[in-house]
Design a protein with these regions (language model features):
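Phosphate-coordination/substrate-recognition cap region in phosphate-metabolizing enzymes
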Residues: 44-110
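A short local structural element in Rossmann-fold oxidoreductases
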Residues: 23, 69-70, 103, 114, ...
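Loop-to-helix element that buttresses phosphate recognition and phosphoryl-transfer chemistry
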Residues: 17-71, 122-137
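Short, basic/glycine-rich phosphate-binding loops at helix/coil junctions
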Residues: 22-25, 109-121
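Short, Lys/Arg-enriched N-terminal segments with co-localized hydrophobic residues
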Residues: 1-4
Length: 167
């Protein structure tokens, strides 16, 4: 218990591999699907979590996370609830590029990104780390409040999970 409320246990899962993960290409909020390895990984995590008592499975609404969540849902026998608040960070112009391409085209931005400056936003619609933290905190707090004393799975992206681990 915490503050008079029962804690919610959250099992956080990153989506399976995509071809863009293999190429080290920034996906952001582009809807890139799992590759064969990613589908295998999704089935494996579904099997690994099949003995867990899950009250709910929440997923980013992007295909790579949702497909991973469906594998968990198939094993658990409950539906996936898609939530846009679990989407990956918006990377603006950087989406679809590798870090080397970003560094060559926008060296100052690449430097700022690498330094993890909380207020810095990727050019043309990118999301700062502070904005990402606010979104992830709000989303996960809301999901946890709906399931006090229960266990849920949250299937998302590397940036979301990195943020979740830091809050």
């Amino acid at each position: 218990q915490w503050g008079g409320m029962e804690a919610t246990r959250i099992i956080a899962v990153r989506h399976g591999e995509t071809s863009w993960n293999v190429d080290a290409r920034i996906q952001g909020q582009l809807d890139i699907q799992l590759n064969d390895t990613g589908r295998w990984q999704a089935r494996r995590v579904g099997h690994a979590l099949s003995s867990e008592q899950l009250s709910a499975i929440y997923s980013s609404d992007l295909g790579r996370a949702h497909e991973t969540a469906r594998a968990i849902a198939d094993a658990a026998g409950i539906p996936v609830v898609a939530h846009s608040g679990l989407r990956e960070r918006r990377f603006g112009l950087f989406e679809g590029k590798t870090f080397d391409e970003i560094h060559q085209t926008w060296p100052d931005h690449a430097h700022d990104w690498k330094k993890r400056i909380p207020e810095w936003e990727p050019p043309e619609g990118g999301e700062s780390l502070l904005q990402l933290r606010e979104r992830v905190t709000r989303t996960v707090s809301d999901l946890a409040a709906r399931h006090c004393g229960e266990q849920i799975a949250v299937v998302a992206h590397g940036g979301v999970l990195d943020t979740l681990y830091r809050i």
